[in-house]
From Swiss-Prot:
This is Tetrahydromethanopterin S-methyltransferase subunit F. The chain crosses the membrane at residues 53-73. The gene is mtrF. Belongs to the MtrF family. It comes from Methanopyrus kandleri (strain AV19 / DSM 6324 / JCM 9639 / NBRC 100938). Its EC number is 7.2.1.4. Part of a complex that catalyzes the formation of methyl-coenzyme M and tetrahydromethanopterin from coenzyme M and methyl-tetrahydromethanopterin. This is an energy-conserving, sodium-ion translocating step. The keyword Ubl conjugation does not apply.
Length: 75
């Protein structure tokens, strides 16, 4: 059971699985405590500290700057 928990933590934080679950728990909590910026609680997705709306904003910028002109030139 401890092995499955370690594998889960490896998926969440992108760190190697640790046999010592106490050390792994401490590591996960340290990462969560240090993942605050812009006055908001950052969420951990695939090992990256991602602001809640940063992905949406980047996607909109990508679509507006790159995809829309490309589509306009294609037609």
């Amino acid at each position: 059971m401890a092995e499955e928990g370690s594998e889960l933590k490896e998926v969440i934080i992108g760190a190697p699985a640790m046999a010592d679950t106490d050390r792994a728990d401490t590591y996960v909590n340290d990462v969560r405590d240090s993942s605050q910026f812009f006055g908001r609680d950052a969420r951990l997705y695939f090992g990256l500290n991602v602001n809640r709306f940063a992905g949406l904003a980047c996607g909109m910028v990508f679509a507006g700057v790159l995809l829309v002109p490309l589509l306009l030139l294609a037609f």
